[in-house]
Design a protein with these regions (language model features):
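Glycine-rich phosphate-binding loop
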Residues: 118, 125-142, 333-340, 417, ...
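Small-residue (G/A/S/T)-rich helix-start motifs and N-terminal tracts that mark the onset
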Residues: 1-84, 91, 95, 197-360, ...
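Nucleotide and nucleotide-moiety/phosphate-recognizing core
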Residues: 37-134, 142-164
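Internal gly/pro-rich beta-alpha loop/helix module
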Residues: 124-129, 134-226
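Short acidic loop-to-helix transition motifs that present clustered carboxylates
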Residues: 113-117, 166-172, 195, 367-370
């Protein structure tokens, strides 16, 4: 499903009218009917129910005027309050919708003084449902004056709120919210999903999100310049590797994992086990010699090999050749989980990356090895995927975590292209950015994934999929989606252990392939 930012949506609106001869009033009225239908669906029936619509003076308000007219036709008792503008000051398509509304029995009044606010507050208190049509995707910053008061009125009402396109004062680009942004129970967004509706904290203010088809020409939407997508079963189904009926373990691919150290054997075990559960035919784990026996006892399906150490848990230079030789004979390498952050080990990691010729998943301690050495990423011959959480990403690029979370999509896209890497920026939601500028926003998973080892499982999933004759980019997209879907189908909200998560992977894969 394609995603757009505010500027891209504005360009589509203009293109629909200028190049495809679609009247703006037609698009507005289709949007209005979609909002009215959403209100209707939110109530058992509209016959005699009270709906109060708060409208601004722009196009978002125009959608509200039209929705009020449709609701009146559906049998609701409708009252409309125009905030921040006199009725005769409304212009454009919104004025046309207002004129049609005024021909109905709906009450329409502008809030121009304190007495009007008292009336509006009383009406909202008696309403069954409120509609937020105050300000659309173009609004940024903090609300002031009448707009601020209207936002507070709706939030304080404790009524069910349906927002038009985006809740007022939620940034439709990056999900930032003003202090008094409207908290909607349902958001009806028009034509295409806006990125800010999927990013926190804005996502929390949207409630249920409905995408409305308002009659945008399909050809125009398909040719939209945006390369941003929300992941769905349909997208992932086309990318997942399939297995022939007569396949043997060699056909299913070989994954090498370089991970673990004393005290951190769990990370190595989880990533290795996840690679198996993701479908890799053969998985070999290379770990410091002092961790080998512990991990061999934990992993019955994985071949465990010890690496030369300078001292227990600290890799020496001799480990480099062993990992490179065996990884280059396989289909993919995953490196980093629990490997350790000693300078000697970190240098081994850097040397491995520079000598590697097969695709590699770089995570955890291997990302730490790249701090201050990101030039290695552009020097590498191998295709690569990086899987940082916001803290790791912040350290890699010298920014604050808050800066990363405030601009997840753009930052991920920038560095994926700069480093010529697939960048999996973990979080809510996880963003997958590709070197060609394509960005995917994940739609699966929940806070159930907020548990130690979850990231190690993701690393193993991506490696296990990449071993099966799909590209690293495809493996990252599928891996992130299946990782979240496994958590979803577990039915566990709190207390989902990372090892349990991996056990749901085959079921998650089957659900995607079957279209469930």
């Amino acid at each position: 499903m394609k995603l757009v930012n505010v500027q891209e949506m504005k360009q589509l609106d203009q293109l629909a009218t200028a190049e495809y001869a679609v009247p703006g009033i037609l698009l507005m009225d289709n949007a209005a009917q979609a909002v009215a239908d959403a209100v209707n669906d939110s109530l058992d029936e509209l016959d005699g129910e009270s709906v109060v619509v708060f409208c601004g003076g722009g196009n978002n308000g125009g959608d509200g005027f039209g929705a009020a007219r449709w609701l009146q036709n559906y049998g609701a008792r409708v009252r409309v309050f125009v905030v921040g503008k006199a009725l005769d000051a409304v212009t454009g398509d919104a004025a046309a919708e207002l004129a049609m509304l005024q021909k109905t029995d709906a009450k329409v009044e502008a809030i121009v003084g304190e007495d009007d606010w008292v009336v509006a507050e009383l009406a909202a208190a008696k309403a069954d449902i409120l509609v937020d049509a105050l300000a659309g995707t173009g609004f940024h910053g903090e609300p002031e004056g009448d707009l601020l008061r209207a936002c507070r009125l709706m939030n304080d009402s404790e009524k069910y709120i349906v927002a038009v396109d985006v809740p007022t004062c939620v940034n439709a680009d990056n999900g930032a919210v003003a202090e008094n942004a409207v908290r909607a129970d349902k958001t009806v967004t028009m034509a295409l999903l806006k990125t800010g509706l999927l990013l926190y904290p804005g996502r929390e203010y949207c409630g249920d999100i409905e995408l409305a088809d308002i009659g945008m020409p399909a050809k125009m939407v398909e040719e939209c310049a945006s390369k941003k997508y929300r992941l769905t079963d349909d997208i992932v189904r086309e990318l997942l590797p399939l297995r022939k009926a007569d396949a043997h373990k060699g056909d299913a691919g070989r994954a090498v994992i370089c991970a673990g150290s004393p005290g951190f054997t769990g990370a190595a075990a989880l990533s290795s086990y996840a690679a198996v559960k993701a479908g890799a035919g053969l998985v070999a784990l290379y770990t410091p010699l002092s961790s080998r026996d512990v991990l061999a006892g934990k992993l019955t399906e994985v071949m465990v090999h010890g690496l030369l150490e300078r001292m227990p848990g600290i890799l020496g230079g001799g480990a480099t050749g062993d990992v490179v030789k065996n990884a280059n004979a396989a289909d993919v390498l995953a490196i980093g989980p629990g490997l350790g952050t000693s300078e000697s080990t970190q240098q081994v990691v850097r040397d491995i990356l520079l000598q590697l010729q097969v695709p590699v998943v770089i995570d955890a301690d291997a990302l730490t090895a790249l701090q201050g050495h990101t030039e290695i990423l552009t020097q590498m011959q191998a295709a690569k995927v990086l899987t940082p959480h916001p803290g790791e990403m912040a350290r890699l690029i010298g920014k604050e975590i808050s800066e990363i979370n405030a601009d997840r999509i753009n930052i991920a896209a920038q560095y994926a292209q700069e480093w010529n890497a697939v960048l999996v920026l973990k979080g809510a939601p996880t963003v997958i950015a590709c070197p060609d500028g394509t960005v995917y926003v994940n739609s699966t998973g929940s806070s159930a994934l907020a548990t130690g080892g979850s990231g190690d499982v993701l690393t193993g999933i991506i490696a296990g999929l990449a071993a099966q004759e799909i590209t690293l980019q495809e493996a990252a997209v599928c891996g992130v989606y299946l990782h979240g879907k496994a958590a979803d189908i577990s039915g566990i909200d709190i207390g989902l252990a990372a090892g349990e998560l991996a056990q749901f992977l085959p079921e998650a894969r089957c659900e995607v392939l079957k279209g469930n």
